[in-house]
Amino acid sequence: MTAAELKASILDLAIRGKLVAQDPDDEPASELLARIAEEKAELIKEKKIKKSKPLDPIVEDEIPFEIPDEWVWCRLGNVCMSIQYGYNAPAKPEGRIMMVRISDIQNGVVCWDGVPYCEIKESDIPDYLLRPNDILFARTGGTVGKSYIVDVVPHEAIYAGYLIRTRYSADVCAKYFEASGISVGRFRSLLRRKAL
């Protein structure tokens, strides 16, 4: 078995809940999802995020494998506070607000020296401003599903139109998505099926 095959095997066991024994003291996933739904409802009420379309429940045909009883199958939209396409504007060599493009992300890192600027209305900036824990996904072309977890934003920056930003509750660790290999295969197939 190669190192890559071993890594894939360990990841597969982990996402199925078979790598370690389940701790009965861990909070059930259903409780976390309920807290996220409450937080989302409050943000909608405060007009900080927009209400999204209701998501279809997971049906039997969509379940690829069994998971521990404390876990729950859900849609990405159930754990995200928001899912939003990026801002469409031409790149500029100078300006105040940087615009991260998929080509600026290499090996999981933004190459900030090459990130261009863009013109954006002041009133639109808060909707597109990147924050730590956001995850960006490429939504078109040969890089569909390529992802980047925003760790640090050294300059005010938004994200370009060919990217999708997912934003999470503080109760959700974006690093989990990276560890689960969401940018590899799984998310790519979700995007292709438009199952978000």
Please report, for each region that a protein language model flagged, where it lies by residue.
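Non-catalytic DNA-recognition/assembly elements of restriction-modification systems
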Residues: 9, 13, 18-20, 60-85
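A short beta-sheet element
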Residues: 101-102, 120-185
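Sequence-specific dsDNA recognition surfaces
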Residues: 57-62, 77-89, 103-132, 150
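Specificity-determining recognition surfaces
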Residues: 181-196
